[in-house]
Structures are given as structure tokens and as C-alpha cells.
């Protein structure tokens, strides 16, 4: 009862790589498409209301904005009752401003989660004629499946492609698809291995003339440039292209339904699926995997319900109309130096915004299962990836004001930017929240009553401060609660997740671990924001996808300073008052225990032990499509000669 995949007995094992002298990979005849760079200073929104926009979309968005405003207004009114009696000082004004912004942030997530919960429970939200319960449609057009790669393990990569290829073949419609491995690899030994493993794959599945390999000599503009190069060379032959990631696996059934959705809706430019995170082995990966399974649909259905035909693009596991992409998604180079200037890093948001500006509808179909990806195995790997995303999202500050964008597209970018600024804002809120009673109550170590922030706040507001805390925690944790309720209402999913009790224990443990890691994430995200603002570029490295194996020296280098700071802060707080130390306890404990917490959650044996106990379970393999039997993580590790 888990999301771990084991190889199918019927799967042909990949032979070991014994040499690097592969034959020359083939490519189809070129069919160029012009893909001009878009001008961000000129342009207008071509179609304001899309034909495929769901009915009542204005009412839905009014609910989101109005619900967010109403919830925030109530919380601000209670906060004012805490601050107002003695007048509002400068520090209290700063506290109030931060509180308004941060509470509005979580209130918007709360409103989306409520909408998503209603949609999930009602089994609603299906659109574009894509119904997974109906017979598989017959396709009329050709589609290219693109798998970009950058210094990845070729055997792992192409095991995933084999899984997809065989699953598409099982639908009986393989003749409508071609498969492309688009390599941006810069390491020669990996590039040579890619060619060899590619040829082995073609021989094994008889994929010559249908599976193609192309390696760029100049990997300009990273993944966005990789895909754009393919569009300019081969895009004219394919009305649709399905973008994959190096760890993506999709079922043939899902792929065929996505293509049919594009064929039947000629004004749709993109359909984004909700990838389920699978193959987690470490404790960290398994808790992320479980959370994505239980809470993820609640959030995703809410987002899809409110965004309508202006949904976003996540860069992979999505199908795109090739001509629309070529006409409108050519990314310009941003003015200025890195990290804000240069090539657009988080290209997916910008490509979606430009395609919507060009008049194309953008949809998300979270109910369509059969779309999978893998998550980072450790918190460290997540934060390394998050640092790149931080730079890419902050770079959107140069794009959000582009002419002609739909206001929902601008909101996507502002939310991405805000996600990273909330980390330092939470830190400031906590520091000011402690600083106000210190400044107002004074520090009298010899007094009869020790200093207590709780006594200060309660005394100033007749207990209203505690209601602010309760309200904030409820709004923060509501998506987890709603996810659990939705799980209880789905007996099949509930059994697959270990039953009501084990699922509740899993949610509780995930919440505790997330709370312990929250100060670490807050600190490192804040540092990432300041590094980007200071002009430090994140670079571009291959993502770690194997089980975490973190050495103690590496852990001390990464988290030693944070641990020392947490212990120091705890000692100072205790010297002032034990009550102050208790008030700051969650942050102090998270920082002080960062090394053991990261180490524990990075262990495979810890994750597997909890799996055997029925904790952090997701539906068992037997309920999943056969394509899950050959995922990237099940391929034998590739060993090559580095010389």
C-alpha cells in the first residue's frame, strides 16, 4: 500500500552498458516553424472571454477575491482590537502591515482549498470533453512527445521513455506519436552514453523511425531554448507536442485523451495535468508523496476551478498546441545582468501568459490521472531546486507588467513572486511580535513576575490575541483537514492510504515534521531572496533524483550555522525569561534540530520502516497502470567510463 514501484516480471531488462560506440541517432525530416521573439512592451489581449471558459467563472473569481477579503478583514479587525487600545506605535504599524499581507496570503489558499474540496467531493470540474470513464477516443492527428534532458543518467531517463512508449502502444494508436529525446547534456561521457542507450532502446522496442534523439551543441536558454530549437526545426509536422520532464511517466490512456481534448477544442492552446509524485523511498520523499496525494487534489481542483481558461503551465506533463506555441511563446532575453536579466529561467509561467495574450485558452485537468513525476529525495535537494525557482520567480518582476497580459496571468506571476517574499516576511512578523512586548513591557530580570509575551498580549487585548493565533492556525491547517475529510468520503482511496487511523497518524506526523522543517525552509528561502536581490546567480545543475545519501560533513556545512544560531537564540530567550523561550520554542527547536531532522528524513530505511507500518501510504501498485512498472527509478544505474 504505497507509491513505490517494482519492476514487472514481464519487463525486458536493459542490458549493461559495455561500450560507448553507439550508432548515429536518426532524426525525421525537418519541418520548420517560425518562432519569433515576443515583445513585452507591445501587444494586446486578443480574446477576452474564451469559448471553453467554464460557466460562472466571474462568480467563482468573485468568491475567491471576496472570500479572501472577508476572511482577512475579520482577522484584521481582531488584530486591531489587540493593538488599538493604547494607540499604534511604529513597530505595531509594521506588525499590522505584515499581518494583513500574510493573512491575506493564507486566506486566499484557504478559499481555494474550500472550493477544491467541494469540487472533489461533488466529483465535478470535468471539462473539454475529457472523461476518463468513457471509451478511449480515436485520434486523427500526430503528436510529438518531447523529453528534454540535461546531464541525467541515460538509463534512468530512457527507462521512463520506454514505459511511456509501451503504454502508448497498448492503446493501439502508436502510429499517431513520435518520441524525441532532446539532450542539452554538456558532459561528453554522458552524451556518448545517451546515444548508446538510445540505440539499445530503439532495438529493444523496435522504435527506429519513431523514437528520435537530438543533442544540441549550444544549450542556450536552457530548457526553454531546447524546446524552442525543436519547434523551429521539426514543429511543423506535429499539431501537438507533449512536454515531459526527465522523471516524468504518463500512461498511454491519459496521453490519448489529452490529444483528443486538443483535437476537439481548436481554441485550446495548452492542457496541464496534475502529476502525482511517486517512487518516494526516503522519509522526506514519502511524506511529500503522501501530502501530494491527500492535500494536492484539494488545492489543484480549487486552482483549476477559479482559473478556468486562464490556467497556468508547470513546464512538464502538459500538452501544447505547437503552432500556438510557436506564434506566441518565443521568449525574449530580458534586459540587464543576471540574475534578473538574460534568458527567462521560469519560462513556463511566461509562455502560458504569452499564449493566453495571443488568444489561446489554457486549461488544467486535475481529475485526469495517469500523470506521474518524482520528487526530491531530501530537504537539501528540495532547497537546491527551490533556489533556482526563487531566482526564476523573482525574475518575473520584469515580465509581470508586459503589455496585453490577462490579469489572471499577472496574478500567477505575482503569486510566484509572493511565495518567496513570504518567507522573510514571516521572519520579520515573528521578530516584531516578540520585539513589541520587549519594548513595551521592558526586561526586568529582577522583577517579581518574569517577562512573558503571552501576558503582555493578553493583558492588552482581553484575550483576543489567542483568537488570532487560533484563527491563523485553522486557516493554515484547513487544507490538510479538508483533504482528510475528502479521503474519508472515498472508501477506496482511504483503504489504499492505510485506513482512517493510519491516514490520520500520517497527517499528524507530516504536520509535525513540516513544522520542524519550516524554520529551516524560512531561513534558506529568505537567504535565497537576499542572494538574488544582491545579484547572485543560481547556476544550472542536474537535479538529484536518487535516494538521499547525505554525509555528516555535508550536513554540518549546510546546517551547522543555523543550528548554532538556534541554540544561541534559545539561550538568550531563556536568559530573558523561560516564557519567552517557550513562546519562541517552535522556531528555536526547528533550527537547533535541523541537522538530525534533515538526516533522519533523508534516510531510505526510515521511509521504508514507516511504509511497513502503514504510514505515508498511497494506493498500491496493483491499482496503477502497467506503465508504472518501468519508471525511471526502476532502471539499473548506469555505469560509464569517465575517461
Swiss-Prot record:
InterPro entries: Glucans_biosynth_gluTrFase_H, Glyco_trans_2-like, Glycosyltr_2/OpgH_subfam, Nucleotide-diphossugar_trans
Keyword annotations: Cell inner membrane, Cell membrane, Glycosyltransferase, Membrane, Transferase, Transmembrane, Transmembrane helix
Main location: membrane
Gene Ontology process terms (BP): glucan biosynthetic process
Region Disordered, annotated ranges: 1-32
Locations listed in the record: Cell inner membrane
EC number of the protein: 2.4.1.-
Family, similarity comment: Belongs to the glycosyltransferase 2 family. OpgH subfamily.
Name under which the protein is recorded: Glucans biosynthesis glucosyltransferase H
Organism from which the protein derives: Xanthomonas euvesicatoria
Amino acid at each position: 500500500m504505497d507509491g513505490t514501484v517494482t519492476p514487472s516480471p514481464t519487463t525486458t531488462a536493459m542490458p549493461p552498458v559495455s561500450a560507448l560506440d553507439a550508432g548515429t541517432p536518426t532524426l525525421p525530416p525537418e519541418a520548420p516553424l517560425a518562432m519569433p521573439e515576443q515583445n513585452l512592451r507591445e501587444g494586446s489581449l486578443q480574446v477576452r472571454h474564451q469559448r471553453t471558459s467554464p460557466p460562472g467563472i466571474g462568480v467563482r473569481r468573485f468568491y475567491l477575491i471576496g472570500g479572501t477579503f472577508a476572511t482577512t478583514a475579520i482577522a484584521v479587525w481582531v488584530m486591531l482590537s489587540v493593538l488599538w487600545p493604547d494607540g499604534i506605535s511604529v513597530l505595531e504599524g509594521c506588525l499590522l502591515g505584515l499581518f494583513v499581507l500574510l493573512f491575506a496570503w493564507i486566506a486566499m489558499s484557504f478559499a481555494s482549498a474550500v472550493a477544491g474540496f467541494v469540487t472533489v467531493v461533488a466529483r465535478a470540474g470535468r471539462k473539454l470533453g475529457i472523461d476518463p470513464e468513457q471509451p478511449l477516443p480515436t485520434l486523427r492527428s500526430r503528436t510529438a512527445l518531447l523529453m528534454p534532458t540535461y546531464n541525467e543518467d541515460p538509463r534512468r531517463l530512457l527507462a521512463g521513455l520506454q514505459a511511456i512508449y509501451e503504454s502508448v502502444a497498448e492503446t493501439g494508436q502508436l502510429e499517431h506519436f513520435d518520441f524525441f529525446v532532446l539532450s542539452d547534456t554538456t558532459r561528453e561521457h554522458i552524451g556518448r552514453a545517451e546515444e548508446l542507450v538510445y540505440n539499445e532502446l530503439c532495438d529493444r522496442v523496435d522504435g527506429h523511425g519513431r523514437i528520435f534523439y537530438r543533442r544540441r551543441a549550444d544549450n542556450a536558454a536552457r530548457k526553454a531554448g531546447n524546446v524552442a530549437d525543436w519547434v523551429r526545426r521539426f514543429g511543423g509536422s506535429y499539431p501537438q507536442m507533449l512536454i515531459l520532464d526527465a522523471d516524468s511517466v504518463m500512461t498511454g490512456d491519459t496521453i490519448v485523451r489529452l490529444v483528443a481534448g486538443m483535437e476537439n477544442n481548436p481554441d485550446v492552446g495548452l492542457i496541464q495535468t496534475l502529476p502525482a509524485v511517486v517512487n518516494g523511498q526516503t522519509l522526506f520523499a514519502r511524506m511529500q508523496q503522501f501530502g501530494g496525494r491527500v492535500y494536492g487534489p484539494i488545492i489543484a481542483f480549487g486552482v483549476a476551478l477559479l482559473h478556468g481558461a486562464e490556467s497556468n503551465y508547470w513546464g512538464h506533463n502538459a500538452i501544447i498546441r505547437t503552432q500556438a506555441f510557436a506564434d506566441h511563446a518565443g521568449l525574449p532575453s530580458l534586459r540587464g545582468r543576471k540574475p534578473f536579466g538574460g534568458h527567462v529561467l521560469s519560462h513556463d509561467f511566461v509562455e502560458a501568459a504569452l499564449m493566453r495574450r495571443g488568444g489561446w485558452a489554457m486549461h488544467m485537468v486535475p481529475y485526469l490521472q495517469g500523470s506521474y513525476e518524482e520528487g526530491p529525495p531530501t530537504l537539501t535537494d528540495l532547497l537546491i531546486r527551490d533556489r533556482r525557482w526563487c531566482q526564476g520567480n523573482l525574475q518575473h518582476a520584469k515580465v509581470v507588467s508586459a503589455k496585453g497580459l490577462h490579469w489572471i496571468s499577472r496574478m500567477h506571476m505575482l503569486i510566484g513572486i509572493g511565495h518567496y517574499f513570504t518567507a522573510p516576511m514571516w521572519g520579520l512578523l515573528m521578530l516584531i511580535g516578540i520585539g513589541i512586548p520587549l519594548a513595551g513591557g521592558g526586561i526586568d530580570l529582577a522583577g517579581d513576575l518574569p517577562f512573558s509575551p503571552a501576558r503582555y498580549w493578553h493583558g492588552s487585548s482581553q484575550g483576543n490575541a489567542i483568537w488570532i493565533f487560533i484563527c491563523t492556525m485553522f486557516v493554515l491547517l484547513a487544507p490538510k483537514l479538508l483533504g482528510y475529510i475528502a479521503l474519508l468520503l472515498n472508501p477506496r482511496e482511504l483503504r489504499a492510504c492505510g485506513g482512517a487511523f493510519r491516514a490520520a497518524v500520517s497527517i499528524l506526523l507530516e504536520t509535525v515534521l513540516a513544522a520542524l522543517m519550516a524554520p529551516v525552509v524560512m531561513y534558506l528561502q529568505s537567504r535565497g531572496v537576499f542572494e538574488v536581490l544582491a545579484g547572485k546567480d543560481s547556476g544550472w545543475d542536474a537535479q538529484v533524483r536518487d535516494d538521499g545519501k547525505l554525509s555528516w560533513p555535508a550536513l554540518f556545512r549546510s546546517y551547522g550555522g543555523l543550528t548554532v544560531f538556534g541554540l544561541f537564540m534559545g539561550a538568550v530567550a531563556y536568559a530573558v525569561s523561560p516564557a519567552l523561550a517557550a513562546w519562541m520554542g517552535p522556531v528555536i527547536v526547528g533550527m537547533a534540530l535541523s541537522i538530525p531532522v534533515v538526516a533522519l528524513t533523508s534516510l531510505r530505511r526510515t521511509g521504508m520502516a514507516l511504509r511497513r507500518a502503514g504510514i505515508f501510504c498511497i494506493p498500491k501498485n496493483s491499482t496503477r497502470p502497467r506503465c508504472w512498472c518501468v519508471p525511471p527509478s526502476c532502471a539499473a544505474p548506469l555505469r560509464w567510463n569517465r575517461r
